C-alpha cells in the first residue's frame, strides 16, 4: 500500500515536549506516533497505531505457532471473580474501581486470570479437552501512582496475556517452555536486546517465574548477571547468601556504651575503632553494625498497619522494591515521625532488636544475621549502642527477609563468579501459576481414570504498546527513530526531493512498483516542503529504507538511505528489485 504524506494525519515537532524525560517519549511525540490525553493516557495516531499493529502481528504469529487460540474478554469486569481470588483487595489502589447505576461494583481489568479460569470451568470438564492455551490482546488498566515516560509506564496499555491449562505438572512444564521459546522468537524478530531473568511471582502467585527485560539505562528495573555462568535475575528475586552460623558458647557478653557522636554508620564505626572495640579480633567495619529499619505493614483487608523491624547489616541500604516484593501482597511503607511519637519505645536512630521484641514488634532479619553472629546496634536509648549483641542468644528474629540492596561484586549463586548490575524495562513475564486460580474457582475435571482432577495453569504476559516504546529506546539516534522492518509502519519512505516534473513522476512510479512488490510505502509528495525538511522528517519518522529521487535522477541514479546506516547510489532501473531484496534480508 501507499500512504501519501500530503494526506497523512501527521504533524511532526522540532522541540521535545516539556513533560518528556526519556528518548522514547520525546521521539514518539515529536514524530507524531502518540499524543498525550491525560497523565499516563495516550492516543495512538496513525503511524503509531500501524507500528503497534505490526507488533501484534508478530505476537499472533508466534502464539498461533505454539497452538494458542485467540479470544477476547471484556475490559469492564464484575467484582465477584476478583473477590474469589482476593485480588479485589490485594491490588490495592492500583485497581480502577467503579459502580454502575444500580450500585454494583466493577473494575477495569488489570489482568484476566480469573476470567480465563472461570471460562474454562464453564466449558471444559474432561481430560480429553486438555491441554489448551488461550490468549488475548487486550487493553489493560492500572492506576499507576506515578505514570511516567510516556507509554513505558501508563495507566492504559495493550497487553498480550495467555494462559495454559494442563492436567499435570509435566504438562505445565512443557507449556511454559513453549511460551518461553515463543517469547524469545518474538523479541529476536523485533530486534530487541534483552535478558531472561529469574523473578518473583508477586500478586500473581505460583512458583516458577521469569521476566524478559529489555536492556536500557532508563529502565526502572535493576537486574543482575553473573560474571561466569548463565545466572540472571531481577534484583527483587536475588537470594542472599546466608551468613555462617557460629557457636554461641564462649562469646563475650554484650556491653552497652554511651555513644554521643554516632548519628551515622560511619560515625559509629569511627567511635568503635577509637576505643579499640574489636569484632572477631579485627577492626570494626560498617558490615559489623546492625541497622534496624522500622516499617509499617498492612495486610490485605486489614484496617491498620502493624509495625515491623527490618534488620540489615550496616553496610547495606534498604531496597524498597526488594522489601515490597518480600512482603507482597501486603503494603509496606517506612515509619514516619508520628509513628515514633506514638510509640515512645522507638528511639529514632537507636532502635535495636531487643527493644522491639520486648514491645511485641515483629522482627525480620537479613539472611546474614544468623545464630552466633555478633553485632553493634542500637540500645533503644538515646546516644547509646550495644556492642557484641549476638543473634540467637540476645535476640532471635521472627523470620528472614530479602530487603537489603544488592551490590556490584556480590557473590553469584552456585559459585558462578560475582554479580554485575544493569538496568532494564520489563517487556514480558511468564509464570507457572499452578493451581492457585483453578482451585479458587473449583475447576474440576475427570481424568483418564474417571477421578476428579484440578488443572494447572501457566500465565504469560507481554506488553505490546510498551514494546514499541522500548524499541524506540533501543533504536534511535539524535536525528530520530530507527525501526526494524518488522515494526516500521512502512518499510520504505520515498522522497521526491526534486521539483522537476520527471523526478516527481518517477517517484510516483517507484512508490507504485514498491507497493506492487508487497511493500508498504510512505510517499513524501508534499509539493511546498523543502528537501531539507523532507530529509529531517524521514530521519525522525524512522522507516528502515528511504529512496531519494533528486538531481541524480536525470542521469538515471537514485539514492538509497538505510536508516542508521549507509547511503548508496543505485541505478534507477534496478532500485526496486534491490530494495525488495534488502527488505527480505532484513526480515531474516
Swiss-Prot record:
Give the location in the cell. Cytoplasm
Name of the gene encoding the protein in the UniProt record: proS
Family assignment?
Belongs to the class-II aminoacyl-tRNA synthetase family. ProS type 1 subfamily.
Q: What does this protein do?
A: Catalyzes the attachment of proline to tRNA(Pro) in a two-step reaction: proline is first activated by ATP to form Pro-AMP and then transferred to the acceptor end of tRNA(Pro). As ProRS can inadvertently accommodate and process non-cognate amino acids such as alanine and cysteine, to avoid such errors it has two additional distinct editing activities against alanine. One activity is designated as 'pretransfer' editing and involves the tRNA(Pro)-independent hydrolysis of activated Ala-AMP.
Q: Catalyses which reaction?
A: tRNA(Pro) + L-proline + ATP = L-prolyl-tRNA(Pro) + AMP + diphosphate
Per its record, what are the GO molecular function terms? Answer: aminoacyl-tRNA deacylase activity; ATP binding; proline-tRNA ligase activity
Q: Which NCBIfam families match?
A: PRK09194.1, proS_fam_II
Q: Kindly state which keywords UniProt assigns to this record, in alphabetical order.
A: Aminoacyl-tRNA synthetase, ATP-binding, Cytoplasm, Ligase, Nucleotide-binding, Protein biosynthesis
EC number(s) recorded for this UniProt protein: 6.1.1.15
Query: One biological process GO term for this chain?
Result: prolyl-tRNA aminoacylation
Give the record's subunit note. Homodimer.
UniProt cross-references to Gene3D superfamilies, sorted A to Z: Anticodon-binding domain, Bira Bifunctional Protein, Domain 2, YbaK/aminoacyl-tRNA synthetase-associated domain
This chain's protein is named Proline--tRNA ligase
Domain topic, free-text comment: Consists of three domains: the N-terminal catalytic domain, the editing domain and the C-terminal anticodon-binding domain.
Amino acid at each position: 500500500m501507499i500512504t501519501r504524506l500530503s494526506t497523512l494525519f501527521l504533524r511532526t515537532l522540532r522541540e521535545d515536549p516539556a513533560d518528556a524525560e526519556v528518548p522514547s517519549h520525546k521521539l514518539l511525540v515529536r514524530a507524531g506516533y502518540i499524543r498525550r490525553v491525560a497523565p499516563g493516557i495516550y492516543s495512538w495516531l496513525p503511524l503509531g497505531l500501524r507500528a503497534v499493529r505490526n507488533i501484534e502481528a508478530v505476537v499472533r504469529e508466534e502464539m498461533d505457532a505454539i497452538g494458542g487460540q485467540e479470544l477476547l474478554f471484556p475490559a469492564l469486569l464484575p467484582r465477584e471473580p476478583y473477590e474469589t481470588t482476593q485480588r479485589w483487595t490485594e491490588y490495592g489502589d492500583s485497581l480502577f474501581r467503579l459502580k454502575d447505576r444500580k450500585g454494583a461494583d466493577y473494575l477495569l481489568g488489570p489482568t484476566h486470570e480469573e476470567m480465563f479460569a472461570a471460562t474454562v470451568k464453564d466449558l471444559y470438564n474432561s481430560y480429553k479437552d486438555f491441554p489448551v492455551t488461550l490468549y488475548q490482546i487486550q487493553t489493560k488498566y492500572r492506576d499507576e501512582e506515578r505514570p511516567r515516560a510516556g507509554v513505558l509506564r501508563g495507566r492504559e496499555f495493550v497487553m498480550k496475556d495467555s494462559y495454559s491449562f494442563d492436567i499435570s505438572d509435566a504438562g505445565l512444564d512443557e507449556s511454559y517452555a513453549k511460551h518461553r521459546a515463543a517469547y524469545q522468537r518474538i523479541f529476536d524478530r523485533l530486534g530487541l536486546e534483552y535478558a531472561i531473568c529469574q523473578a518473583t511471582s508477586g500478586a500473581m502467585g505460583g512458583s516458577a517465574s521469569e521476566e524478559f527485560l529489555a536492556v536500557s539505562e532508563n529502565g526502572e528495573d535493576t537486574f543482575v548477571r553473573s560474571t561466569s555462568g548463565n545466572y540472571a535475575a531481577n534484583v527483587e528475586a536475588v537470594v542472599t547468601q546466608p551468613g555462617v552460623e557460629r557457636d554461641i558458647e564462649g562469646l563475650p557478653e554484650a556491653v552497652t556504651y554511651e555513644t554521643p557522636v554516632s548519628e551515622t554508620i560511619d560515625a559509629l564505626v569511627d567511635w568503635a575503632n577509637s576505643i579499640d572495640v574489636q569484632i572477631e579480633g579485627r577492626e570494626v567495619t560498617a558490615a559489623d553494625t546492625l541497622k534496624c529499619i522500622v516499617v509499617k505493614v498492612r495486610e490485605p483487608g486489614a484496617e491498620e498497619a502493624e509495625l515491623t523491624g527490618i534488620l540489615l547489616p550496616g553496610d547495606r541500604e534498604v531496597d524498597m522494591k526488594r522489601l515490597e516484593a518480600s512482603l507482597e501482597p501486603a503494603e509496606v511503607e517506612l515509619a514516619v515521625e508520628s509513628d515514633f511519637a506514638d510509640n515512645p519505645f522507638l528511639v529514632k536512630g537507636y532502635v535495636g532488636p531487643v527493644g522491639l521484641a520486648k514491645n511485641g514488634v515483629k522482627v525480620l532479619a537479613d539472611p546474614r544475621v544468623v545464630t552466633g553472629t555478633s553485632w553493634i546496634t542500637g540500645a533503644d536509648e538515646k546516644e547509646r549502642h550495644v556492642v557484641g549483641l549476638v543473634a540467637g542468644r540476645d535476640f532471635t528474629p521472627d523470620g528472614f527477609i530479602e530487603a537489603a540492596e544488592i551490590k556490584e561484586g556480590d557473590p553469584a549463586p552456585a559459585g558462578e563468579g560475582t554479580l554485575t548490575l544493569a538496568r532494564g524495562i520489563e517487556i514480558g513475564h511468564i509464570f507457572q501459576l499452578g493451581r492457585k486460580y483453578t482451585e479458587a474457582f473449583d475447576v474440576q475435571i475427570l481424568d483418564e481414570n474417571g477421578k476428579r482432577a484440578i488443572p494447572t495453569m501457566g500465565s504469560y504476559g507481554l506488553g505490546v504498546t510498551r514494546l514499541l516504546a522500548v524499541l524506540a529506546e533501543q533504536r534511535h539516534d539524535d536525528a530520530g527513530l530507527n525501526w526494524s522492518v518488522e515494526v516500521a509502519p512502512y518499510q520504505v519512505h520515498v522522497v521526491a526531493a526534486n521539483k522537476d516534473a520527471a523526478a516527481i513522476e518517477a517517484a510516483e512510479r517507484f512508490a507504485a512498483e514498491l507497493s506492487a512488490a508487497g511493500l508498504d510505502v510512505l510517499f513524501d509528495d508534499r509539493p511546498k516542503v523543502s528537501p531539507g525538511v523532507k530529509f529531517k522528517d524521514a530521519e525522525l519518522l524512522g522507516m528502515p529504507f528511504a529512496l531519494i529521487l533528486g538531481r541524480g535522477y536525470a542521469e538515471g541514479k537514485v539514492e538509497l538511505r538505510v536508516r542508521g546506516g549507509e547511503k548508496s547510489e543505485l541505478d534507477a532501473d534496478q532500485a526496486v528489485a534491490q530494495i525488495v531484496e534488502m527488505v527480505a534480508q532484513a526480515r531474516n
